[in-house]
Amino acid sequence: MKVLVINAGSSSLKYQLIDMTNESALAVGLCERIGIDNSIITQKKFDGKKLEKLTDLPTHKDALEEVVKALTDDEFGVIKDMGEINAVGHRVVHGGEKFTTSALYDEGVEKAIKDCFELAPLHNPPNMMGISACAEIMPGTPMVIVFDTAFHQTMPPYAYMYALPYDLYEKHGVRKYGFHGTSHKYVAERAALMLGKPAEETKIITCHLGNGSSITAVEGGKSVETSMGFTPLEGLAMGTRCGSIDPAIVPFLMEKEGLTTREIDTLMNKKSGVLGVSGLSNDFRDLDEAASKGNRKAELALEIFAYKVKKFIGEYSAVLNGADAVVFTAGIGENSASIRKRILTGLDGIGIKIDDEKNKIRGQEIDISTPDAKVRVFVIPTNEELAIARETKEIVETEVKLRSSIPV
């Protein structure tokens, strides 16, 4: 089975074509600047050949048409025609409370995605554009929707409810949803394999650390707590997001600075985090370099980030009543040995000790803990596209079996 995985953003469309026979990526591509001047599509195939093409991409449909051309190109393509693609898997950020798993796309699923537009106004609408374009260009090809929020639907009510009047939850769906679910699920499953235990018997803390960051407590293979909340703003300090703060700061700053609701939202989401503290950058590599040269604000930004992660690891150790492993993944989690060390230093009291030399190894799954550590620490590169492809394959094959078992 060949699965096309699509992640549509407001002005971009990422894609991978994965051969599920051996779970290998045949082609990886990106359409950028959709609806903007100087649009470009880039695609790299399994043998290293790379296509770069400047072209007009007014809409997501135009972008997907270019994807079709690239995948079937005589020189840079990897298939003869789109009929070789058996299914399409789409990433959708928000599924609300309606989806605890991925779902085969139909009119009901489409309505549910649109119902969540107000919960994820920056993400669900462009996700839907990608789905609609695909339905038009590849009619008859089954599509599976994989929701970022679905993995966290196993949280108990006392974990996902806020201590606000209950009717606000009933009327507006105000509760914790959590995000990065596909990544957290993937690395938790990999960690269980590295532990040599069935997922049902594990307690794992997964740390997805990138420009957007979240931490999840996974017990028995299920999410029981996560750091992001009603929106991805809650939780850790991030690249440009402030994370959890005293809510009273919001009206205080609106009054003192004369800010509108949109302006305070922009301040917290786009101008805060390590960028806001450092006044320099949201790129942790820049901050690492600046801090090493004595930039105090860059150092403070890194200290705040590491401290918040450390607190959540301790908190989730309590939630799980002890953890078997802590996992680091995503851009920072996988690649920054210095930030991992900042986070993990001083956690020997809860059984975490790391080997400094192992911690410096990059680009592979590795146990960086010392032999005598009670809690294993794994660095596991995430692969959300493969996770989406696996979900897509499973759901499509299950649906085919169900249909074939129904008597005519």
Swiss-Prot record:
ATP binds at residues 14, 208-212, 283-285, 331-335. Changing residue 14 to R: Reduces enzyme activity. CDD domains: ASKHA_NBD_AcK_PK (cd24010). GO terms for molecular function: acetate kinase activity; ATP binding; magnesium ion binding. Changing residue 12 to A: Decreases catalytic activity. Strongly decreases affinity for acetate. Requires increased magnesium levels for enzyme activity. Changing residue 7 to D: Almost abolishes catalytic activity. Strongly decreases affinity for acetate. The keyword Transmembrane helix does not apply. The record marks 180, 241 as: Transition state stabilizer. Mg(2+). Can also accept Mn(2+). The Mg(2+) is bound between two conserved protein residues and the ATP phosphate groups. Keywords: ATP-binding, Cytoplasm, Kinase, Magnesium, Metal-binding, Nucleotide-binding, Transferase. GO terms for cellular component: cytoplasm. Its cofactor is Mg(2+); Mn(2+). It comes from the Archaea. Belongs to the acetokinase family. This is Acetate kinase. It comes from Methanosarcina thermophila. The lineage of its organism: Archaea, Methanobacteriati, Methanobacteriota, Stenosarchaea group, Methanomicrobia. The gene is ackA.
